[in-house]
Amino acid sequence: MTVLSISVGGCVVTKQSGSKKSMDSEIILFDGKNLDNWQPTDFAGKGEIFIDKNGSLVLEMGAELSGLHWKGEALPTSNYEISLQAKRTMGSDFFCGLTFPYKETHATLILGGWGGSLIGISSLDDFDASENETGDAYIFEDNQWYDVRLKVTDSEFTVWIDGKSVIDCEVEGRRVGMRPGEIEMSVPLGICTFATTGVLKNIKLRKI
């Protein structure tokens, strides 16, 4: 099997020749070198965003939201997975608010919200992550990397943390949308924190 790496619009797309599924491809959304395909989101009171010496993306603590959103080529809106590693280094609220596309709308995966330990997806049937069935408590330690994977299909959202399934939610026929407010500026794909410093790396998308 031959592995080819092709640069497309600043993204690196890795394809395996001979694969049974030609749609299987991995898009490196953040390569640790530049943010050419990203734009800082104009949140009020936002913190600084930069790449540190280790090639990790740092979203520094702001008054409330700090983050950036995708401005590169169009990404799939269903049948894909996003994987990343994230950690909280300062603060007590969410260190990874991952806004992602779903068909004609968007939603946000929250890690560490509402005081630092809530996970969930905002919003389902107009209920945010603290109010719908995806909301749960998860203890995050500061300065510890967590492996995160989000799978989006037409019928289901699934989330794993460190290989363990923590959210498995049927969404077909339901109202999927974003919590009203500034976070709506994170579309089509965005990452943000709330009054917290978050560090991320190895951000990838894979079509399924």
Language model features by range: what are they?
Residues 1-7:
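Bacterial N-terminal signal peptides
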Residues 11-208:
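Carbohydrate-interacting regions of secretory-pathway proteins
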